Amino acid sequence: MLLSFMLRLLLLDLDNTLYPESRGMDRDIVERMNGYVARYLGISTRAALALRRERAKNYGTTLEWLTVEQGFTDPESFFAAVHPEGEEYCLEPDPQLLRALDAVDLPKAVLTNSPSEHAYRVLRKLGLSDRFAAVYDIRFNALRGKPHAEAYRRACEASGVEIEETLFVDDMPKYVRAFLDLGGRGLLVDEADRFADEGLPRVRGLVELPGYLAAP
């Protein structure tokens, strides 16, 4: 396991990491995303869902797929449609999460493939705005986010640390694995125990993080 004194930064994903997937926010985001793709391509929502599942998995984000394969050039309209004001209605502060984060004596930052306005809404609703020194969003990474190596490197460089000194926590195996491949330390949030076969260090939620770091 890890010892916190070996680390200089805790770098956290946002969605389905700082709050449980079971809250339903990701479901709402995906529905809006499918609707946007359907309107842009002029196809049914069901067809958009199928096409996203087939093609977007080859990219870091749906936005990157649309840009590369579909000639998409209006990311701001995409962000506005997928992340409207009030989207955070289903979230609420979690005292256990607050205690867990406060128990980890490391600077903390967010690395997300979403836009900053979404990230700040989520952090405010969760009561976590003052727990993070920085938010590195998709614009910070020139719309090429995780799992591109430069996304992780930029975040660590901006935080003044090396990748090897950073623990990155995410709910997506491919994003955690990409960070591990760079020599960093990675941890997967696997709330529903779906990824036992991935061979990655795992916790069910961030409330387990202090115990994970303290384990021998």
List each model region and its residues.
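Asp-based, Mg2+/Mn2+-dependent phosphohydrolase catalytic module
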Residues: L2-R8, D102, A109, P115-P216
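Residue-level marker of regulatory loop/turn positions in helix-turn-helix DNA-binding domains and
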Residues: Y89, P93, L111, R144
